[in-house]
């Protein structure tokens, strides 16, 4: 186990030493030469032709003026803010500008104006060399002359030749062109299309309900008539009428009111069958009559149907008490059909 550890330590030390040696050798091999050790004119001489231009057409850098750098005194004066100058010479700020920039500004002011059509030529340096800070020198760029050939306008020879041939042709040989007769077009009258209006059907007015016919005043009559030619006696007759809630009243006849006290409206009345149809006011113990008639006037107070049923019931009871017969309005024996007709008539007035 210890031998294996010792072997690993030795191998690790050898590997570290090899890496260090390889790094030193690589750094020395790739160490670039200083830019100042070689003259400026000898850079990339192998890539230039006999006239001094490289394969891109860029010539060598020419120094036209190498004025000594002016000493710029640095004062510890108060810092100035940058100002705008229109047409005046720009004064360098010792706090804002460096000596190199001041030299560049002074040299650029003395340079002649360059042509706008000249191309910018940049010097090409090798990638292995370290570029130091450039020296502020003015470089005059030579304008590149470009020969522009003016296009030659060619005359239309074919047009001229055709024009001369037309002029040389005699007039007799020119074919005559007959004018085509232009027939005037007939103005067609456009008939307007019938416009079909969307007729919205008006809603039909609902028929107004017909007013119910006004029933004319009428009556229903029943009579109690004595049998076998006998007469109804006054005292017995009056007592029987009063027992069935009939009250002697207006016009000297008996009335059945809506209430038993006689204060409500009259429902039906009982009169004498003999003219003038009234009863004696003094009691009339000697009074006699062949019969008594009951009348229900239509329209009446309350329900005509109920009033008729009440009158029919009263007439039947009085006829039973007096041993008499019940007659209709024609003085004939009343029948079930006649009673049904009376009820239908009373029903009509009840709905009115």
From Swiss-Prot:
The keyword Secreted does not apply. Residues 27-352 are cytoplasmic. InterPro entries: Cell_div_ZipA, ZipA_FtsZ-bd_C, ZipA_FtsZ-bd_C_sf. Residues 35-54 have a biased composition (Basic and acidic residues). It is a single-pass type I membrane protein. Coiled coil: none annotated. Pfam families: ZipA_C. The chain crosses the membrane at residues 6-26. One of its GO terms (cellular component) is cell division site. Residues 35-56 are annotated as: Disordered. The keyword Kinase does not apply. GO terms for biological process: division septum assembly; FtsZ-dependent cytokinesis. Interacts with FtsZ via their C-terminal domains. This is Cell division protein ZipA. The lineage of its organism: Bacteria, Pseudomonadati, Pseudomonadota, Gammaproteobacteria, Vibrionales.
């Amino acid at each position: 186990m210890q031998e294996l550890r010792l072997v690993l330590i030795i191998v690790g030390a050898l590997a570290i030493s090899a890496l260090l040696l390889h790094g030193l050798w690589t750094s020395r091999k790739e160490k670039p030469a200083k830019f100042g050790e070689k003259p400026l004119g000898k850079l990339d001489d192998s890539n230039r032709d006999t006239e001094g231009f490289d394969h891109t057409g860029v010539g060598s850098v020419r120094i036209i003026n190498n004025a000594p750098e002016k000493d710029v005194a640095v004062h510890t004066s108060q810092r100035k803010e940058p100002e705008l100058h229109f047409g005046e010479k720009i004064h360098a700020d010792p706090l804002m500008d460096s000596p190199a920039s001041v030299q560049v500004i002074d040299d650029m002011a003395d340079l002649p104006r360059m042509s706008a059509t000249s191309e910018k030529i940049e010097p090409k340096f090798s990638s292995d060399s370290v570029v130091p800070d450039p020296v502020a020198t003015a470089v005059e760029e030579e304008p590149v002359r470009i020969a522009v050939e003016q296009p030659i306008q060619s005359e239309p020879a074919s047009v001229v030749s055709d024009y001369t041939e037309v002029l040389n042709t005699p007039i007799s040989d020119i074919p005559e062109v007959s004018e085509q007769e232009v027939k005037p077009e007939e103005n067609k009258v456009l008939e307007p299309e019938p416009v079909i209006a969307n007729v919205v059907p008006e809603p039909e007015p609902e028929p107004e309900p017909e007013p119910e016919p006004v029933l004319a005043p009428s009556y229903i009559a029943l009579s109690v008539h004595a049998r076998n030619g006998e007469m109804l006696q006054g005292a017995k007759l009056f007592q029987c009428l009063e027992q069935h809630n009939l009250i002697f009243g207006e016009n000297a006849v008996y009335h059945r009111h809506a209430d038993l006290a006689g204060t409500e409206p009259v429902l039906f009345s009982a009169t004498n069958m003999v003219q003038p149809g009234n009863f004696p006011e003094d009691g009339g113990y000697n009074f006699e009559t062949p019969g008594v008639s009951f009348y229900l006037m239509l329209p009446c107070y309350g329900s005509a149907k109920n009033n008729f049923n009440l009158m029919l019931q009263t007439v039947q009871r009085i006829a039973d008490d007096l041993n008499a017969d019940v007659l209709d309005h024609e003085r004939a024996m009343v029948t079930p059909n006649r009673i049904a007709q009376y009820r239908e008539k009373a029903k009509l007035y009840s709905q009115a």
